Amino acid sequence: MSLARNLSHRTLAWGAVLLLWVGFVWGHSLVGGAASSAESGRVVALLRPLFEATGVTDLDLMTFIVCKCAHFSEYAVLGGIARAFWSRVSRELGSRASSSRHQVLLAGLVLTALVPCLDETIQLFVPGRSGSPRDVAIDLAGAATGALLTWLFRRARTRER
């Protein structure tokens, strides 16, 4: 509990948002295969005119693209939230020595990278679902993109001041 006492309320709020988002991601992984396919089907039906306008007419390909974009997107959000949280923790707990700050950021990176690994493991135990190393790679790419975009946004805002 002493760790939490050393963090600001704003940082703790970012931590809560991060935990809620991880819960959302893992909760989504607990949805059975049939329900997950139905959800993807609804999105495909909505986007079908856009797919067809770009020359994509294969329904399986549309579904594949929607599913992989969903993976990427939910992890881009996770990456952005995680970057905000771990950067704040690093600033608040890390000493002035950059090695301490880097250790905090490295711990955050490792913990964030474990989320998609556990996500795909969860899916191994859900009827109609499967875990995939390819999905872990897509998830990690999404998280990295989200972290990069939020870092760039913060950097641009800091330069404006």
Label every PLM stretch briefly:
Residues M1-F125, P133, L140-R161:
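Bulky hydrophobic segments
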